[in-house]
Amino acid sequence: MWRIWRLFDPMRAMVAQAVFLLGLAVLIHLMLLGTNKYNWLDGAKKAPVATAVAPVPAEVTSLAQAK
């Protein structure tokens, strides 16, 4: 294994690896930010939920009005 470093300069190999990993991390984060589920900056966009309107009683009397 030590002979591989005779072919490649260790400093250039580590810098190239760091640049590659940084680029890969940025790419993955941008892909996740582009999705609705994993976008942690804007939060998940919730679809509007249709709700049924509950019937309200016709006449409501409070205790203050009853006195």
Swiss-Prot record:
Location in or out of the cell: Cell inner membrane
Pfam families, per database record: LHC
Main location: membrane
Ranges of the Periplasmic topological domain: 34-67
Intervals, Cytoplasmic compartment: 1-12
GO BP terms: photosynthesis, light reaction
GO cellular component: organelle inner membrane; plasma membrane; plasma membrane light-harvesting complex
Keywords, sorted A to Z: Antenna complex, Bacteriochlorophyll, Cell inner membrane, Cell membrane, Chlorophyll, Chromophore, Light-harvesting polypeptide, Magnesium, Membrane, Metal-binding, Transmembrane, Transmembrane helix
Stated role: Antenna complexes are light-harvesting systems, which transfer the excitation energy to the reaction centers.
Quaternary data: An alpha/beta heterodimer. The core complex is formed by different alpha and beta chains, binding bacteriochlorophyll molecules, and arranged most probably in tetrameric structures disposed around the reaction center. The non-pigmented gamma chains may constitute additional components.
Species in which this protein is naturally found: Rubrivivax gelatinosus (strain NBRC 100245 / IL144)
Entry's family note: Belongs to the antenna complex alpha subunit family.
Annotated protein name in UniProt: Light-harvesting protein B-870 alpha chain
Signal sequence region: none
Amino-acid positions noted as binding a bacteriochlorophyll in the UniProt annotation, renumbered to this chain: H29
Membrane topology, as annotated: Single-pass type II membrane protein
Transmembrane segments: 13-33
GO MF term list: bacteriochlorophyll binding; electron transporter, transferring electrons within the cyclic electron transport pathway of photosynthesis activity; metal ion binding
Gene3D superfamilies in UniProt: Light-harvesting complex
InterPro entries noted in UniProt: Antenna_a/b (IPR000066), Antenna_alpha (IPR018332), Antenna_alpha_CS (IPR002361), Light-harvesting_complex (IPR035889)
